[in-house]
Amino acid sequence: MKLHELKPAEGAVRAKRRLGRGTATGQGKTAGRGQKGQWSRSGGGVRVGFEGGQMPLARRLPKRGFNNIFKKVYTEVNVEVLNRFENGTEITAELLKSTKTISKIGKDGIKILGEGNLEKALTVKAAKFTASAQEKIEKAGGKAELV
C-alpha cells in the first residue's frame, strides 16, 4: 500500500451541511437559527466576557499589583553549567544562546550565579555576577568581566 492509495473508511466522510439552500434540505429558510432575535442576525451575539448585564467577573475581582517599568530582567546562569565549555573559552550571552545553554537573553543581559563548582579557567562576560560566582570563576583561574 502506498500513501496515494489510502482512503477513509466507508461512511466516515459526510458531506458538509449547506445551510439556507431550500426547505427540502431541512436547513432552509432560517438555516437553524430559529425565528427572530439577536442570534438570528448577521453579526449577532455578545462580546467576550459579557454576562447578560450583570457585573462581569473581570470587574468584580480587585486589581492587583503593577508592572515596574524600571525592573531589571536578567537570564540567570549557574557556574556549574559553564563546565561544558573548553578551557580558556570566552563566555558571552550570545555564545550561551547559540549553544542552546540558555533559551533567550534577558532584556538586561545575563547574571552568573554561584550554584555548583567550576573546574575550567574561563573568561566570563556578563551584566552581573553574584559574589560567590565571581569567587569561583577567579578560583578556577578565569576572569569575570562586567559588560
From Swiss-Prot:
Keywords on record: Ribonucleoprotein, Ribosomal protein, RNA-binding, rRNA-binding
SUPFAM superfamilies reported for this sequence: Ribosomal proteins L15p and L18e
GO terms, molecular function: rRNA binding; structural constituent of ribosome
GO cellular component: cytosolic large ribosomal subunit
InterPro entries recorded: Ribosomal_uL15, Ribosomal_uL15/eL18, Ribosomal_uL15/eL18_sf, Ribosomal_uL15_bac-type, Ribosomal_uL15_CS
Highest taxon, organism lineage: Bacteria
Biased segments, Gly residues type: 23-35
Region (Disordered): 1-47
Any one biological process term the GO annotation gives: translation
Task performed by this protein: Binds to the 23S rRNA.
Subunit description: Part of the 50S ribosomal subunit.
Family per record: Belongs to the universal ribosomal protein uL15 family.
Protein name: Large ribosomal subunit protein uL15
Organism: Clostridioides difficile (strain 630)
Gene symbol of the encoding locus: rplO
